[in-house]
């Protein structure tokens, strides 16, 4: 059974929640095995804080309740839709299993409730360990992005070669191990691994952080 290890970088108390735990048991779709098969393999990240921002593209300016939690530049603001990077919540993932794909996706309620959509992407996690990257784009630039603590922000899924395999998601809580992992990750160059993000796992392309779990 594939195991995904992860740590919370922004706030150690942040935890990924199985999407199945957030769906009311009374919904009729919970009787569908196809629906349930995906839900138990999908996890939701929620906001650990209250947060708000607004964009003024004419002045290349972003007003924000916590500006230290944003990353952006002029190019991102001036794209057809502004793209802004949130540094929360942030998780670092690792697996020792081969050919496990990591899928980062938006959560449908953010477009309705929070005025943003998370930008999706995926890659072969077995070949590279990296932090989740929460880039968002605004739905309506004339409105603020307003996030309340506990609001869902994005979803992640993990795809093994056999899609019928269950996924074990294991959170690391030992602070020394967490710091060791974060330090090791920061010392590695992502550039060297980009050609392997979408390739099949081989011994020589195996993620370099396995020593942390020996």
Locate the predicted segments by residue.
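Non-catalytic terminal segments and appended small domains
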Residues: 1-131, 137-214
